[in-house]
Amino acid sequence: METYIIKRDGKRELFTLDKIKNAISKAFLAVGAFATEETLGAVLSHLRVHDGQTVEEIQNQVEVALMAEGYYQVAKAFILYRQGHTEDRETQQRLDFMMNYVQASNAAEGSKFDANANVEHKNIATLIGELPKQGFIRLNRRLLTERIKEMYGKELSDKYMSLLNQHFIYKNDETNLANYCASITMYPWLIGGTKSIGGNATPPKNLKSFCGGFINMVFMVSSMLSGACATPEFLMYMNYFIEKEYGEDYYKRADEVVDLSLKRRTIDRIICDCFQQVVYSLNQPSGARNFQSVFWNISYYDRYYFQSLFENFRFPDGEAPHWDSLNWLQKRFMNWFNEERTRSVLTFPVETMALLAENGDIKDKEYGDFTAEMYAKGHSFFTYVSDNADSLSSCCRLRNAITDNSFSYTLGAGGISTGSKSVLTINLNRAIQYAVRNNIPYQAYVEEVVDLMHKVQLAYNENLKNLQEKGMLPLFDAGYINIGRQYLTIGVNGLVEAAEFLGLEIKDTPEYAHFVQELLGIIEKKHKEYRTKDVMFNCEMMPAENVGVKHAKWDREDGYVVPRDCYNSYFYIVEDKSLNVLDRFRLHGRKYIEHLTGGSALHCNLEEHLSQEQYRQLLRVAAIEGCNYFTFNIPNTICNDCGHIDKRYLKECPHCHSKNVDYLTRVIGYMKRVSNFSEARQKEAAQRYYAEKEKAPKC
């Protein structure tokens, strides 16, 4: 019977003894000896080759066989021969990667490990950033598995690697040594500059130094994170410095000329120039982030949310923030940013409007109306609706519960210092199909995998604490981030696909709601089991820019049922034309997200913008249904010929009438040109269903 072995690239190949004989003969020649047929026969008699064995396993047997026969020098030569071939293969792999990368259609398509649409152009800087990624993955896995062995034993460590290699779980951001994302407090910078995190800047003293210093600080902080950097105090701090220069009532005198230069600028013009300086600077590619811009997020607050978060906040001079001027500044920035996006493609900041809900509506009527007005003007931002000021976003959709709102001069503005240290994701579609195939209750198997994931995250946390003890995490030491307020996140992917496999209809039905609650409830139960006073867990519906595509590809290759080329990151099928806008809000309502403590954002895709009244009604729908995190996604049209940007979803440029147009839309949580997406994500974007205006709720 023919025997097939597994090569290093995973391909099956017919086993031939001649290749082994040739390799052994070369090893003998390398030490000045000659292998006779009798010698070869003696060595080969130790080998046990069976179908499905890997090349590495057979070569390991050869090493042992040579030593068993007493040929120690030959065994050493054989080991060196293997090592040399390994190095040659790795070098060739890097050369092949380089060639493929430079020929790829864009940077996201060329990236082998973590395709990212935030990298707009591939060049030598992005290539330099890509080459070491495989090494970082190996290093991160070694660090983590060694810690798992120390804490839980080799068996659990091996099981983790097995689940990882078989794609039941996915470790996010393995190409980076840094922790994931953070919503930082800027108070340490306000009182000490950047010296505590390795910079040399003193604290900001005026509006000009605030803007320049803020840019530098965000770049520095982002270089020490693998994900997003949220600055929820940004506009509040800017407002403080504007007041110091132009008075607490500056917003009432916005048209007053205060610049004595030839430009004769008004207060409003100076403020808009500050907006421009900060936003355009932070949208520039950064060398410290492989030539991509920082992932920068900010928050706006209604009056009640602001009071709840910052009621006890005081600036270093003892002054409290003033709501009336901040209210004006928030609205001014939002309107400016909306208009500026018709002049240039500006991805960041990712904005979140934080609103408190009460009795089925937005409590602050002024901000409910203003939010609807900005959506109607074509602005694209997230809205977070909550019954209390319990959470902040530190990423495109990641929600972090606030455990303590108290203010401290030492640590900064209380609960806004939060985030996620690490994300580990379960592939629910594969896990559930595997369980069904093997006659295991899928609930029990999911619980088993999730239990292991919590242990792995605790091992990661110990490694992080060790880095902090060695002085390698200045953001924690300086108080920008509080390690006790950061979460270990369990990500979820393939939930909709798993439900489809089980024959469930992906609509708001009791059966589907029970399935979602049951699975997410298992994860939340484990959170409570493993939580301590020092460690917190949450669960996030993964954005899955990369892994949604990877899971579908890997599962299909291994014979699992895969209904689409990219796994959903919503509770509904994104290409389903039968669902109206209200259905989508309901499917992201409280009964579906109840156990999803780390957040899930509804991207409500619409063909065209709604009226202010319709958006206002949808805010009420969100409050009633308990849909707490959402945005409206209407592709903006960008002309490739004249550069004109239009907020509408058009087939030709309204300015020069060219049909050579591109679209600006959200790949996951952040907005980019569709042409910057990876090929797989471009296909996914083309299949999204954008609801027609008449299917929106009437008022």
Residue ranges and their predicted role:
Residues 1-107, 482, 686-690:
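Charged, amphipathic alpha-helical regulatory modules used
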Residues 483-491, 681-682:
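Core of folded catalytic or high-affinity ligand/protein-binding domains
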Residues 269-272, 500-501, 686-691:
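Metallocofactor- and cofactor-centric catalytic cores in central/energy metabolism, strongly enriched
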Residues 655-699:
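Long, charge-rich boundary regions
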Residues 88, 94-484, 505, 509-663:
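Conserved catalytic cores of very large enzyme subunits
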Residues 236, 488-501, 521, 666:
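Contiguous, well-ordered alpha-helical segments that form the cores/surfaces of helical PPI scaffolds
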Residues 3, 45-49, 311, 497-504, ...:
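Short, hydrophobic beta-strand segments
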